[in-house]
Amino acid sequence: MWLKYNRRIYQINWEGESMAEKNKTKAYEIGELDHYLFGQGTHYEIYKKLGAHIVNDGEKQGVYFAVWAPHAEKVSVVGEFNDWDAAKNPMKREEPLGIYTCFVPDVQEGALYKYCIQTYKGDHIYKADPFANYAELRPGNASKVTDISALRWTDSKWMERRLTWDHHKEPMSIYEAHIGSWKRHPGREDDGFYTYREFAKAATEYIKEMGYTHIELMGIAEYPFDGSWGYQVTGYYAPTSRYGTPEDFAYMIDYFHKNKIGVILDWVPAHFPKDAHGLADFDGTPTFEYADPRKGEHPDWGTKVFDYGKSEVQNFLIANALFWIEHYHVDGLRVDAVARSEER
């Protein structure tokens, strides 16, 4: 899927006031315009508001957390910084969409965290952040506070050329690769995976030798089970930590671009797994998936199906596609299981 789009600019006045005047919010906080656009399914930068965002604005230092859990009774953020105690950092519910927010001072980059959600039944479930940009290395499954706003890029020439590139006319030859099985270091005690940086250099040499123009990367978004090859995603906004950090992932993309190699990601918007820390029954109810089990599950795969009828779910997925293209400079997406999506 190649994405060419025009940004839509929204200017909304409430009783004569501009949104900036009406909101009176910090840049990292959820405002009325954010609620409106997310509810309409058109907040294409919602990942800048939901999730965990490091704050250092001269007045506050810490992390601002925000999560969509519309049917939760209560939500708290728990982590290393509060001994995983749900009583210490309760979150405030913001209407009308059921977004929970809180600011926790002095939380450092790299801290592990989850959301403790009290369901309508009174149960407590612990969920990873759907908008987390980094995840704990498996078998751990917590989210990890990180700042990806200052990634270093040196591919400006490639990005400028991309604006006018006509992929219908220029030649294209795509090399598909899965980092975890492409090549491994023999004799190591761990799994022997190449890191993002190691793979970038080794794959570039092979791709240039064979004359490919693009690489298509399989299984990049975070996932719990190695055997799924990345097609059962739990962290849609996080490059998997198996091969390194977000900075390492950005380095890989940048390295390919400097060598005039385009990058396509396999993207999985059709379904997601039932792992307890993931999106399934996120707030104790079908949140991201269809409530009707006849529509909400893939019987062959044992996975959940996104409810494309919900504006917030549409927004989650569209913003995710744009996130990879805008924030990580990815050049295109190969959409997985399209036929299964069309069945819905």
What is each of the regions a protein language model found here?
Residues 16-60, 94-176, 181-188, 198:
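The feature marks proteins involved in alpha-glucan
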